[in-house]
Amino acid sequence: MRSTRSIALATLPAAAAIALWNGYRRVSKELGSHVAASPLIPGKVRSIPTSWGRLSYRIVPGTDPGPPLVLVHGWGRSADSVWWPLIANTQRTVVAIDLPGHGRSLLDQRFTFDLAADAVLAAVADSGVIRPVLVGHSMGGPVALTALRRIAQAGESDFAGFVAIATSSYWVRPRHQIMVAAAPYAMAQGSPILMRAQRAETRRAPDQASRIAWEYAVRPPRRILEEAAAELRRFDARRWDDLSLPPAVWVITLDDGIIDPADQVASAQNLGIPTVDLPNDHPVVIQAPAALARIIEEASSVWSLNRPIRIRRRMLRPNGADQNP
């Protein structure tokens, strides 16, 4: 009797492993039935050779004479996969940047926020936009703050304003540390956790299955996720004494499961930035793009009063510098 029970207990780990593997295969097969397809996004993709690889960004000319928008995406995403809903809901000129190692931007060295900030400023200079509004979502907030700090250190003022969305000026709390340390493994391509998240999202919106598959397919490799997560774990702008901000607004996502709304509010208060609340979760750009566009446009219209907003005449480009979307 004891022998039979011992054998049964010994087989439990193997049975559990087989069950997990079969579950993984079922989820993989279900997700594999959806063909990844991006939404139609206007504008052109431009690329710049750099010392660290290649910088790519999308520029969308707008009809609204207000300040252009420079959009900086968050961790594990790309310009197109985050910002396409906002682009569809604004008539402003938009520059949406793929950070190094993300989207179409290539990176042959370690990812850092300083390098990402340089990429943002390089895209602004190459695009020809004058006094744009800098918009950062999630990790894009720290990258944008780093870019603004670099400008302040140089004694320059190139932005009409700054909009922080669902982000924090510090990521050093224990909860942040644990979450960010685990994220590169939990959210890398092929991760069972990521696959189950995609399946749940697809089942909630089956008519958007192809678009959802595309958003998950364009995530960066694990190396970039790990290096970006390491930068986040070190980031704390609360003690920066050389940061000079343009007019700004901080969008608080009240139902955020990634960045505690209390940390968002504390970040804004620490930097002296007024806040606007939205009753959304972390992916607010997907959930409420029209409301977000309205907040950005109303704030930046006030900031731009009596300010010349225009686009410089671009220098002639070699053939092939602009790409189709």
Spans of features found by a protein language model:
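Hydrophobic alpha-helical topogenic segments used for membrane insertion/localization
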Residues: R2-R26
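Conserved HGGG/HGGXW glycine-rich cap/lid loop of the alpha/beta-hydrolase fold
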Residues: R58-R104
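Active-site loop/oxyanion-hole signature of alpha/beta-hydrolase fold enzymes
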Residues: V95-V133
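Gly/Ala-rich beta-loop-alpha elbow adjacent to hydrolase catalytic centers
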Residues: G136, G140, A144
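Flexible "cap/lid" loop of the alpha/beta hydrolase fold
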Residues: T146-R149, Q153-Q189
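Conserved serine/cysteine hydrolase catalytic core
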Residues: A229-A266, P279
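Catalytic active-site module of serine/aspartate enzymes centered on a nucleophile-bearing elbow/loop
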Residues: I273-P325
